[in-house]
Amino acid sequence: IGQNHQSGGRFGEPAVTGLSASLKEIGLELGRLKTGTPPRLLRRSINFDKIEVQSGDEPVPYFTNWKEDLFHVEQSEAANNRKLFGWDRDQKFHVEHFNKYPPESILDKIGSQIPCHITYTTKSTAEVIRANLHHSPLYSGKIHGIGTRYCPSIEDKIVRFAEKERHQIFLEPEGATTEEIYVNGFSTSLPFEVQVQMVRTIIGCENAEILRPAYAIEYDFCFPNQLRPSLETKVCQNLYLAGQINGTSGYEEAAGQGLMAGINAARRVNGLDPVVLRRDQAYIGVLIDDLVTKDTTEPYRIFTSRAEHRLILRQDN
């Protein structure tokens, strides 16, 4: 934040520099990347009357295609999973679906989703940022890691797209039981007092209070060409890496790697060959193949443009 910097882990947790040192000791080469997070605002300090409501999808879309109000997953349905993981015993389980929201969930209790809101920066926002760029660690040289190409900080947006008079901002509730509002599209590392000025130039946020300031993060990652297609490290047998440590950015990217690393770790324990998806079989196959065969110089995201077999990878096929 500004000229202040300190080591740390996830929010409120200590740093894990010892883990990085251990990975280096076994022969893994590490690099540095950067990311950022926006400020969190107090919900009741925002004037929502001045901004646009963006409601969630109704009905709520689920990852499953099963639409029945109630369904059961029997052992026959799970047979392929048992084979995949190498289980040699029956895995009995029962799953229930419901009408609208998960039983006993927050959504079930309050009976509806909480909407997001769309607002915009103003000319005053850009003026405050330009006047304080010299305080940003991203521009003063304190941070050297490469950031995510498609999630620029608000400083980068103002500098790189100087012709734009405004930038879209999403105000997203952190949850139903908190007053925190996540200001999506407003990542910054400017000093706190500057952040207060910046936030109050956003439409609807003229009197907003910051509960948690924005900050930039520089973190270690393992160059993923040191991994096998199974996501096992080449230098240390039985060690599998998945997610941001492999130089990726994004929830789906991390989830896909975690799925494959978990499957292959379980299969290794059971003495089975690894599962490796090809580029013509799945986007996970494209993702992992790119990681282990190409040089990663910036946080990696998966796109349809990266898949030469994109027409046969469509979800509608």
What would you call each of these model-derived segments?
Residues 155, 170, 176, 182-248, ...:
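A glycine-rich dinucleotide-binding beta-alpha-beta segment and adjacent secondary-structure elements
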Residues 1-2, 35, 42-49, 220-225, ...:
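Short acidic, glycine/serine/threonine-rich loops at helix termini
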Residues 21-196, 293-317:
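An anion/pyrophosphate-binding glycine-rich loop and adjacent beta-alpha core
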Residues 259, 265, 273-317:
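Non-catalytic terminal regions with compositionally biased, polar/charged low complexity
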Residues 1-41, 202-203, 207, 260-269:
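Glycine-rich loop(s) and the adjacent beta-strand/alpha-helix scaffold that form part
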Residues 17-24, 126-130, 195-199, 218, ...:
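Predominant activation on well-ordered alpha-helical scaffold segments within soluble catalytic domains
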Residues 244-252, 308-311:
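Glycine-rich phosphate/pyrophosphate-binding beta-alpha loops
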Residues 9-17, 188, 255-256, 278-281:
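Short, conserved loop/turn and helix-capping segments at secondary-structure boundaries
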